[in-house]
């Protein structure tokens, strides 16, 4: 049983970093916001999707599928080669994404290039431990085993991985689920269109009205 608390602001995508004092999101206008534990700060730039890792690494993509990485020392965005529609950051070492053709990519931070992964996904998420899950156009769920993607029981349209023990997602009916013991999906109360889980089980999400909610697993 989780207790959802409504949070101030409006977003369409939200991401949890090291904790509830490092929350990033974008709204339906592409505006970027950072919650520091006390208030929302508007950040320069425009993005349609954003993700933050446990180490504070922030990446995003814009409506033209351009990819950006934030330098948090000066709050400036640096463009990264390639094109994606969604990006996921577990940490500096773990960045994945998908493009408009459902192609899957893994960032090689040693050589600053994208490696294409076999398969087709519309949404992907990587945790700080390198755990990767994703969903495809048919709402099927897949897990990366280090060399290939394997089908997982269940149906979702969006999934978020903090680590192997903390995985949440939503389906096409806005129902919210958490993965227990790596195999059982537990339905949570509430309705959300996007959900994100942090290292300590803090969950943030948004609904179809762009309202923001938070809870703890």
From Swiss-Prot:
SUPFAM superfamilies tied to this protein: Calcium-dependent phosphotriesterase
Superkingdom of source: Eukaryota
Alphabetical list of SMART domains matching this protein: TECPR (SM00706)
Location in the cell: Cell surface; Cytoplasmic vesicle membrane
PANTHER family the UniProt entry points to: DYSFERLIN-RELATED, FISH-EGG LECTIN-LIKE ISOFORM X1-RELATED
Function of the protein: Probably involved in bacterial recognition. May be a lectin that function as part of a transmembrane signaling complex during phagocytosis.
Protein family (similarity comment): Belongs to the tectonin family.
The protein, known as: Tectonin-1
Organism placement in taxonomy: Eukaryota, Amoebozoa, Evosea, Eumycetozoa, Myxogastria
């Amino acid at each position: 049983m989780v207790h959802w608390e409504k949070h101030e602001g409006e977003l369409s995508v939200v991401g949890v970093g090291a904790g509830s004092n490092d929350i990033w999101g974008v709204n339906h206008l592409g505006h970027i916001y950072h919650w520091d534990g006390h208030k929302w700060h508007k950040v320069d730039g425009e993005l349609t999707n954003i993700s933050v890792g446990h180490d504070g690494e922030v990446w995003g993509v814009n409506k033209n599928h351009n990819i950006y990485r934030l330098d948090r020392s000066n709050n400036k965005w640096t463009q990264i080669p390639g094109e994606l529609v969604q990006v996921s950051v577990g940490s500096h070492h773990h960045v994945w994404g998908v493009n408009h053709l459902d192609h899957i990519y893994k960032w090689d931070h040693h050589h600053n290039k994208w490696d294409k992964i076999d398969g087709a996904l519309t949404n992907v998420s990587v945790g700080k431990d390198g755990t990767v899950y994703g969903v495809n156009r048919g709402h099927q769920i897949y897990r990366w085993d280090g060399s290939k993607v394997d089908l997982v029981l269940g149906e979702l349209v969006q999934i978020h991985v903090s680590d192997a023990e903390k995985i949440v997602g939503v389906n096409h009916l806005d129902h919210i689920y958490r993965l227990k013991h790596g195999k059982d999906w537990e339905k949570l109360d509430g309705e959300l269109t996007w959900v994100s889980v942090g290292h300590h089980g803090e969950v943030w999400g948004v609904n179809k009205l762009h309202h923001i909610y938070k809870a703890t697993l």
